[in-house]
């Protein structure tokens, strides 16, 4: 009987260790995804930032689904070969910085390709520059 317990206990404990490591790895990857989805901008009004996000999404061929200025969230869709849906949220980071986070999905699958977010933020950087300098 004791022999069976010695065999059974490690068999029951090992899967628990594996799932814990998996959860830690998934948490780490979520942090990395969040980092590539977020860019911080200095000394710009939240309304101006939201207008720049709207312009950027439209320049990239997206149709705006919802724009909630109170919640500082914009959702847009681009239909080509597939449905690409983006939600962008703007929130205060501190008194002189705003964090812009873009979350892109294709058919309910999160896009975790850094190039996708880099392309979006490159265009947004230009739009914010133009807004900051009052260029239409």
Regions found by a protein language model. Give the residues of each.
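Positively charged n-region of N-terminal signal peptides that target proteins for export
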Residues: 1-4
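C-terminal motif of bacterial Sec signal peptides marking the signal peptidase cleavage site
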Residues: 13-16
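Ser/Thr-rich, low-complexity intrinsically disordered terminal regions
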Residues: 18-136
């Amino acid at each position: 009987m004791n022999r069976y317990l010695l065999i059974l206990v490690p068999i029951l404990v090992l899967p628990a260790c594996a799932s814990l490591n998996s959860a830690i790895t998934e948490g780490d990857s979520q942090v990395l995804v969040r980092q590539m989805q977020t860019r911080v901008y200095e000394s710009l009004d939240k309304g101006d930032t939201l207008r720049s996000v709207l312009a950027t999404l439209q320049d990239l061929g997206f149709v705006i689904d919802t724009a909630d200025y109170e919640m500082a969230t914009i959702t847009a869709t681009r239909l080509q070969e597939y449905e690409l849906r983006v939600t962008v949220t703007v929130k205060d980071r501190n008194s002189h910085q705003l964090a812009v986070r873009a979350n892109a999905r294709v058919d309910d699958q999160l896009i975790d390709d850094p190039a996708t977010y880099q392309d979006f933020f490159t265009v947004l950087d230009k739009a914010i520059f133009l807004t900051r300098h009052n260029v239409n």
